[in-house]
Amino acid sequence: VLFTPPELLGCGNRCSDDCCKWGRCQPGCTD
């Protein structure tokens, strides 16, 4: 089964990995 948990999806170029949680950029983070 090819299932990727949301926390492993990443945010692409929207923000840094440090600011990315559950595939979303967290508030208060710089891009």
UniProtKB/Swiss-Prot annotation:
Residues spanning the membrane: none
Keyword Disulfide bond: yes
Main location: secreted
Disulphide connectivity of cysteines: C11-C20, C15-C25, C19-C29
Disulfide bond as UniProt keyword: yes
Highest rank taxon of the organism: Eukaryota
Keywords of the record: Disulfide bond, Knottin, Secreted, Toxin
Designated name of the protein: Augerpeptide hhe6.3
Subcellular location per the Swiss-Prot or TrEMBL entry: Secreted
Tissue distribution: Expressed by the venom duct.
Notes on the domains: The presence of a 'disulfide through disulfide knot' structurally defines this protein as a knottin. The cysteine framework is VI/VII (C-C-CC-C-C).
Listed GO CC annotations: extracellular region
One GO MF term attached to the UniProt entry: toxin activity
